[in-house]
Amino acid sequence: MKKILILGAGIYQVPLIKTAKRLGIYTIVSSIYGNYPGFELADKVYYENTVDYRKILSIARHEQVDGIVTAGTDVAVITIGKVCDALGLKGLSFEAAEIATDKLLMKMQYEKHGVRSAKFRKIFFDDPDYKNIISDLTLPVMFKSVDSSGSRGIVKVTSPEGFDSARRVVLENTRSDYFIVEEFIEGEEFGAQAFVQEGKLEFILPHGDYVFKGDTGVPVGHFAPFDLSAESLADAREQLTGAVRAMNLNNCAINADFIIRDGKTYVLELGGRSGATCLAELVSIFYGFDYYEQIIRVATGEHVDFDSLIKDEASGVANASMLLMSDKDGVIVSQEDLNEPDPDIVEVQFDYKPGDKVHAFRVGPHRIGHVITKGESLDEAVDLLHKALDKIHITVE
C-alpha cells in the first residue's frame, strides 16, 4: 500500500485526504493541533507544524512515504521542497519552493528571464531613505510582504502620504526584514490553474475572479471559462511557460495570477500548488476529471496522461463558485440551505456549525463555507450561483 503525507488538515486539504483514501493510499496528515476537519479523516495524524521541515522530514523518513503534498496554501511549500529533495520524491524542488514563496526572489527571476511583470524595488524596513528608492516608480504602487500568501500584507498606495501606513501593514504581516514595492498595473485581473509534469506544461485553465474589496482585493469566488481572445490566451501561455521555467517549477500544480492590459498579459505571481477558493474543483468540473486525484497520482510517483484526460479544451463545463461570508464577528446561531436538490448545484458547504465563532470577512481564512454551480453556459452557471446563494441563510450574533 502506498503512503502519502498531506501537510495541513484544514478545509483545503480535506478533499486531498478524502481522495487519497478513496485511491487506497495510506493517508498521513500533519498539522498543528486545532479544530481541523482533516484529523478525523486521516489514517494517522502527527501534530507537528508543517513549516518545521526537520520534523516533517523525520516523519516522512520514518513512515517511508511515497509522496508529500498540500493544497490551497503556500505555508507548507518550502517543507515539501525540502522533503522531495531529501527523499527523491516527485514534486517541486527546494530551490523552486523558495522562489515560489518569496515574492522578491520570484520578481528577480522574472526580470532575469524576461517574463513580463511589474517594475519593482526591494526595500528594507529599517531603511530611512526608502521613499527615495521608490521615487522612480509610477503611482499607484503596491506594497507587498514577500512571504505571506493570499492578500495578507498587500496594500495599494495612491500617494506618498500613504507610504508609512502601508509599510506598517506589511511589517505586521511578514517574518522578513524587507519587502517589495511594485508599480500597480491598471487592467483586468484574472487567474489560471495549471500543471507542470516532467518539464511539460500540461494545461492552462484561465479563470475569472470575484473579488472582495477590502484593504486590497481578496478573491472570494471564481468562474470558468474566462473570455480571452486567441491572441491573449497564447500570450498568457507564453508568459506562464516563461515564469514556470524561470522559477524551475516541476511536477506540481500551479496557481497563477495575471493582469491583462492593452492585450498584453503581465505575471503577478505563481504558486507551486493548487489554488484555494474552490479552484481545484473548478478544474475538475471544467475538464471532467478529479483534479485532486491527478495531483496525488503525480505526487506518489505516477505519470498522468493529461492529454487523454483533456479531450477538448474548448468544450469544458462552465462553472462558478463563491465563498460564504459573515459581515460581522460573532457566533453562528443558525444556518440553513433551502435549495432543492439540483445536479447543477455541485456543492453547498458549511465550514462551521451553530455555536462556532466566526470573523467578519477580511481575508480568505475568514470564509465560512462555499457554493459551487455549473451550467450549459457560463451565464447559466452564474445565474444559478446567485439563486443558490439567495436560499442560504446564516445568522451570526
Describe each model-derived feature in a short phrase.
Residues 170-178, 183-226, 234-267, 271-279, ...:
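Phosphate-binding core of ATP-grasp and ATP-grasp-like enzymes
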Residues 155, 183, 228, 284, ...:
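Short, well-ordered beta-strand elements within core beta-sheets of diverse protein domains
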Residues 273-294:
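ATP-dependent carboxylate-activation loops
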Residues 158-159, 194, 324-328, 371-376:
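Short beta-strand-to-loop capping motifs
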Residues 1-95, 301-304, 309-317, 326, ...:
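ATP-binding N-terminal substructure of ATP-dependent carboxylate-amine bond-forming enzymes
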Residues 324-354:
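Glycine-rich active-site loop/lid that clamps phosphate-bearing ligands
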Residues 99-180, 186, 198, 226-242:
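Active-site nucleotide/adenylate-binding loops and adjacent lid/helix of ATP-dependent enzymes
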Residues 55, 129-130, 163-164, 329-335, ...:
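Short, conserved charged micro-motifs
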